[in-house]
Amino acid sequence: LILKEKEYKDLPFVDVVEGDWFYDAVQYARINGFFNGTSETTFAPNGTMTRGMFVTVLGRIAGVDTADYAGQTPFKDVPANMYYAPYVAWAAKHGVTSGMGDGTFSPDGLINREQMATFFVRYFEKFDIDYSTGENITTTPADINKVSSWAQDAVKNLWKQGLLDGIKTDVYAIHDNFAAPTAACDLYDFLSLSPEKIADYLPFL
C-alpha cells in the first residue's frame, strides 16, 4: 500500500467544499481508497459510521487481500457475502476486534469514539506500529471516568500523543457516535504523523 500525498484533485462531492475543516482529510482518504462517499456525488458529512464500515477502512489501510478471508464468518451476525465480512474476519484473526462478547460483531451498529480509539490502538499494537508523536500530554479527558474499562488504556494512550481532539475543552465525548468527517480527519492524522514509521508496516499481510 502506497500512501498518496500529492495527487490531490477536486472532489466530486457537492457537499464537501474547500474551506470545510475536513476537506483535506476527505480528499486524502478518498485518493488512497480508504473510503468513498455515499454516492458518486455525495459524502454525507453529517453521516455516521458503522462498525462494519470502520473495520473495512482499517482493512483497506492494511492492504488486506479479501480473497484470503473469503467465506470466513467468525461472528454469527456477519454474513459471508457482505462487503465488510473479509475485513471483519481479518480483524478478528489478528486481535483487532473480539466482537461484542456474545458471539456477535454488530456490524451495522454505529461506532462510537471509545470503540474507535480501541480499534486504532489494537491495530497499531498488534502490528507493532509506532504511533508516538513526540507529544507528552499529561492531562486526561475530563470525562475519562465515563469511558468503559476496556477502552480506558486506548483513550489515554491516544490522548497522550495528541491524537484525540476533545469535542469541548478536555472533553472527549466518548460515547458520541463517530462521524464520517471525524473518521477522515483521524485517519489523516494517524497516517501522516510519521510516514517513515507507517511505511515499514503497510501492507502487513
Place the predicted regions along the sequence by residue:
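Feature responds to low-complexity, polar/acidic, surface-exposed segments characteristic
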Residues: 1-23, 31, 36-52, 59-85, ...
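Acidic helix/loop microenvironments that form the catalytic cleft of cell-wall polysaccharide enzymes
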Residues: 178-182
